[in-house]
């Protein structure tokens, strides 16, 4: 498949930043303290996650990417920026001293995930006036906006971003989360998966009712399009 040329595209991505951390090693015994495997950790890898992973995917296509989000004032934020810089992504991170950078630690053995530990606290109650100011300034030099919502609080008020972008004639694509899609009204396109759509319209019995429900939701939210991804998560 031949992909279109994205080298001239300028994309502004706003959303929940995460660092995905993987510890891996062999398992050969059960802990004497509890009936759980003991992992002899021999490897560690950090990857951009959440909206940061979206930014990497878009940058890999050749687009010029600016990424806005909130993180802690900590080592994991530094690691995340370093990882993203290798993809020439312009990072506009707002560091919140009383928060940790959202980090998901997965313990792996023999290509299987044994455990996941989440280090996170919502950014929903954090003042976002500085982020909105930077967003408005960045709009003048981008072609399209992507809102990557993982319900971690950075996009607690997506309407303010959608309105600002649409006022400047920018298309807005939303990767939604949760059961309230009203907050994404008037976006250009939203891209829910099947489970996310069902959370809003209820489970559907057949393909015809699924399509009808999606079309009804598109109309009620005044969207230009609704792209349903065929996965459950």
Cite the ranges covered by each PLM segment.
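Conserved phosphate/ATP/ADP-binding segment of small-molecule kinases
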Residues: 152-233
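Structural motif
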Residues: 12-14, 116, 143-146, 173, ...
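Gly-rich Lys/Arg/Thr-decorated short loops/hinges at beta-loop-alpha junctions or inter-strand turns
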Residues: 32-39, 109-123, 192-199
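Conserved phosphate-binding/catalytic loop of the ribokinase/pfkB sugar-kinase fold
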Residues: 93-99, 106-141
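Positively charged, low-complexity intrinsically disordered leader regions
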Residues: 1-28
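A short, aliphatic-rich alpha-helical micro-motif
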Residues: 6, 139-140, 184-185
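Substrate-binding N-lobe of the ribokinase-like
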Residues: 3-4, 8-10, 32, 36-102
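Short acidic, glycine-rich surface-loop motifs adjacent to enzyme active sites
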Residues: 142-154
């Amino acid at each position: 498949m031949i992909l279109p040329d994205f080298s001239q595209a300028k994309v502004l991505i706003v959303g929940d930043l995460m660092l995905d951390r993987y510890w891996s090693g062999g398992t050969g015994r059960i802990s004497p303290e509890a009936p759980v495997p003991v992992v002899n950790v021999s490897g560690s890898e950090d990857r951009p996650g959440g909206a940061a992973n979206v930014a990497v995917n878009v940058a890999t296509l050749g687009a010029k990417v600016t990424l806005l989000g909130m993180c802690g004032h900590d080592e994991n934020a530094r690691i995340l920026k370093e990882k993203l810089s290798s993809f020439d992504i312009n990072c506009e991170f707002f560091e919140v001293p009383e928060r940790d950078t959202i980090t998901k630690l997965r313990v792996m053995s023999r290509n299987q995930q044994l455990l996941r530990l989440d280090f996170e606290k919502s950014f929903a109650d954090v003042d976002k006036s500085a982020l909105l100011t930077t967003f408005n300034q960045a709009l003048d030099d981008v072609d399209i906006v992507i809102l990557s919502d993982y319900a971690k609080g950075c996009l607690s008020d997506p309407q303010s971003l959608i309105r600002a972008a649409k006022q400047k004639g920018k298309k807005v694509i939303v990767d939604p989360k949760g059961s309230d899609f009203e907050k994404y009204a008037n976006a250009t396109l939203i891209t829910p998966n099947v489970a996310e759509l069902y959370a809003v319209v209820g489970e559907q019995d057949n393909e015809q009712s699924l399509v009808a429900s999606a079309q009804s939701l598109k109309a009620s939210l005044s969207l230009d399009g609704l792209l349903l991804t065929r996965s459950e998560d």
